[in-house]
C-alpha cells in the first residue's frame, strides 16, 4: 500500500494561513511557520481588543461629557446623578453626541439635572 502524504490538503491549509497573514511585515507574510505563529497571536490580539474597544469608547464618552459639563459648572458625577434623579434616561454615548453636536440641548439637560439636585 503506498504512502499517502495529503499534498493537496496540506497545501490548502498552508495557503489559508498565508492568506490570513497578508499584509504582515517581513517573513511573517511569506514563511509558513512564522506566519502561523503570527496569525495565532493576531487572533489573540483581536479577541482581546474586541473587548477593550468597548471600554475605550466608554472612557472617551465619559471624558467628553465631563469636559462639556464642566463648561456649565457641574462635574460629570453630579450631572449623571442629577439626570438619574430627574428621571432622564439617556446613555453616555448619546449624551456625548449631544454635547458635541447640540450645545443648547446639552445645556438644557444640565439645567434639568441641576434643578433635580436642589
From Swiss-Prot:
Q: How is this protein named in the record?
A: Large ribosomal subunit protein bL20
Function description: Binds directly to 23S ribosomal RNA and is necessary for the in vitro assembly process of the 50S ribosomal subunit. It is not involved in the protein synthesizing functions of that subunit.
> Which keywords does this Swiss-Prot/TrEMBL entry list?
Ribonucleoprotein, Ribosomal protein, RNA-binding, rRNA-binding
> Does the keyword section mention Signal?
no
| HAMAP family recorded | Ribosomal_bL20
**Record keywords: GTP-binding included?**
no
Q: Which Gene Ontology cellular-component terms appear in the entry?
A: ribonucleoprotein complex; ribosome
Q: Which family does it belong to?
A: Belongs to the bacterial ribosomal protein bL20 family.
Quote the InterPro entries the UniProt record gives.
Ribosomal_bL20, RIBOSOMAL_L20_CS, Ribosomal_protein_bL20_C
**Which CDD domains does the record associate with it?**
Ribosomal_L20
**Highest taxon of source:** Bacteria
For this protein's source organism, the top of the classification is: Bacteria, Bacillati, Bacillota, Bacilli, Bacillales
| GO BP annotations listed | ribosomal large subunit assembly; translation
GO molecular function annotations of the record? rRNA binding; structural constituent of ribosome
What is the source species?
Answer: Macrococcus caseolyticus (strain JCSC5402) (Macrococcoides caseolyticum)
